[in-house]
Structure formats: C-alpha cells, structure tokens
C-alpha cells in the first residue's frame, strides 16, 4: 500500500500502528496497492500468465521502486558495530548534527530499532542499540546523492573506518549510517517483534523534532 502522509507527526503515528509483519519503504511504486514478491517469484508468476486476481504484482527492486520527485523521507540507519557499546538516542542525534548541522533544524524523527528495549519484569534483556533518523527532504530523487555525501562527511569528521572480511577484503564503513539504505527499494523493518510472555517490549515512541519547519533542501 502506498501512503501519503502530510508530516512526520503522521509518520510517527503510523509507525505506532504497525504489526510485526509490517515494514516501510520510503521509495514508492507507481501503484496505490500492489502484491510484492521476490524478483525470482515474480518471473515465475509472469511466465505462468499472472497471479490470477487482477492486482498489480511487482518485485522489491529498482525496476518497481523509485524515489518520489517531491518531498520524501530519508533514513539514516545506525547500528553499533559488534563488540562496541551503543550510543544513546541523544548521543546519536548530536553525532549526526555534528556532521551535518542542517539536519538539526529540519523536520525529523528519532526512532529506536525494532528489536530493542525487551524486558522481563524489571529485567532488561536488551536495551538501547540501533537508531533510525527519518528526515524530510525536498526532493526524493536527490536522496542517493545526499546519502553518499553524508557518508563522505562522516569520514571527514573521523567516524569512518575499514572493515576487514574473513577473506581479507577491506570494506569502507561509517559508524553513523549504513550506506546501503539510500536506495528506494530498501525496507525499514520498524514493526514490533513478537514477544512471548513474560517478555515484552517497552520501546520509546518515535521522537518528533521540528515538525512545523520546511524540509531539508
């Protein structure tokens, strides 16, 4: 389903209604409603003459998802590296602002990762970990360039590093952002986890910042 929301407050409210099986994509397809399959499954469906129900059937790929030309949501996805202590939400925000001050004054949400803040009574099994910053930008078609530029600015600010794979490859990484998410077909798995009692999630609600100002240019 393609949604059109007027501001980040509406986005925050929508996120609060998501089920564990729900995810968001900030790129859009040409259809208001569509059935999404894997690229491989879609090829089989087309070969067999369609899905038989008359609904548009697409894959989650670059062919079927694009950035909108107007206002759009840009996600900065932070997950702490294995073995390193996670940042608090406020520390993450300040780190992002120190790299790009313009974000501080633009409309954005701070959202805890979906699998965080898991409790069993008074015992916290998993507290703060990853965070998402969801910002409103003027032109969705500029997100790919803006994301690349933000990662480069992180490196200039000293928060880039080289990750060594098991086979010795050197991969550039950024402490504040996953560079791969600046693609229209990427999913944000922001629905809550399935918790079996006595486990429960006490994840803070998305924090709305600067809802009434203009988007990031």
Predicted regions and their residues:
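Signature for HUH/AEP ssDNA processing cores
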Residues: 1-131, 135-157
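Catalytic "initiation/cleavage/transfer" segments centered on a nucleophilic residue
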Residues: 4, 19, 154-217
């Amino acid at each position: 389903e393609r949604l059109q929301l007027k501001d980040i407050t509406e986005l925050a409210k929508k996120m609060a209604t998501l089920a564990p099986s729900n995810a968001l994509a900030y790129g859009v397809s040409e259809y208001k409603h569509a059935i999404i399959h894997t690229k491989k499954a879609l090829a089989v469906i087309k070969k067999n003459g369609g899905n038989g129900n008359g609904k548009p059937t697409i894959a989650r790929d670059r062919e079927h998802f694009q950035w909108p030309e107007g206002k759009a949501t840009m996600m900065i996805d932070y997950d702490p590296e294995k073995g390193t202590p996670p940042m608090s939400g406020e520390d993450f925000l300040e780190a992002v602002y120190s790299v790009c001050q313009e974000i501080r004054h633009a409309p954005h949400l701070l959202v805890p990762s979906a699998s965080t803040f898991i409790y069993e009574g008074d015992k916290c099994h998993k507290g703060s970990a990853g965070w998402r910053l969801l910002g409103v930008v003027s032109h969705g078609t500029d997100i790919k360039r803006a994301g690349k530029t933000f990662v480069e600015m992180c490196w200039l600010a000293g928060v880039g590093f080289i990750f060594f794979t098991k086979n010795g490859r050197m991969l550039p990484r950024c402490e504040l952002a996953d560079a791969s998410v600046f693609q229209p077909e990427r999913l944000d798995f922001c629905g809550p986890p399935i918790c079996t009692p006595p486990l429960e999630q006490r994840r803070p609600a998305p924090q709305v910042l600067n809802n009434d100002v203009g988007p990031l240019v």
